[in-house]
Amino acid sequence: MDTTGTGQRGASIVVVDYGLGNLRSVTRGLERASADVSIVGDPGALDDADGIVLPGVGAFGDGMENAGPFRDALTDAADEGRPLFGICLGMQMLLSSSEEADHEGQGDARGLDLIPGRNVRFTGTVKVPHMGWNELAVTRDHPLVGGVDGEYAYFVHSYYAAPDDPGHVVAETDYGERFPAVVANDAGNVFGTQFHPEKSGATGLRILRNFVDYCADQ
């Protein structure tokens, strides 16, 4: 795979620190992709960013509770057309709700509802969590996934995003069933990966470079 994407310098990217997420590894990955990166814990710091990354590891209900102070700032940024990139739990938080909150006894935790849909648990006999490398099958064009069709990325998750509109699915992966690995809204500026690009070697670096280039072009 060609990983020589430029990652245009000058794109200002903020990584949202809401208490859950691989902040350092995500930041290092973005720096390798030539971004100017800051980790921010203040919602007001999102205002001047070219792009926003919402990372996340853990339970949906906890994520939404911790990220509560950022809800309005994230929604405003998305409405303004600025790029918002959710990673793993961060991607799931872009949706409307999750079965996980119900299973954890947290009730109906509300997501950001930037991509209508619900996160659901794997069914059948597959081992959960889905952990390890798996293949990406791109289903529609989006700047984030240029050059990664058929490549492998690293996953760790028990739930996955199920958008109401199948047109919001950008790439799929097979783990006993086909599930969305990358999703995006209609406008294309809000998107997420179920896998961890910062842990996905050359494939992940290509995706992060695609993201930085997209932010620089806006």
From Swiss-Prot:
Pathway: Amino-acid biosynthesis; L-histidine biosynthesis; L-histidine from 5-phospho-alpha-D-ribose 1-diphosphate: step 5/9. One of its GO terms (molecular function) is imidazoleglycerol-phosphate synthase activity. Residues 12-218 form the Glutamine amidotransferase type-1 domain. It comes from the Archaea. One of its GO terms (cellular component) is cytoplasm. Pfam families: GATase. It catalyses: 5-[(5-phospho-1-deoxy-D-ribulos-1-ylimino)methylamino]-1-(5-phospho-beta-D-ribosyl)imidazole-4-carboxamide + L-glutamine = D-erythro-1-(imidazol-4-yl)glycerol 3-phosphate + 5-amino-1-(5-phospho-beta-D-ribosyl)imidazole-4-carboxamide + L-glutamate + H(+); L-glutamine + H2O = L-glutamate + NH4(+). This is Imidazole glycerol phosphate synthase subunit HisH.
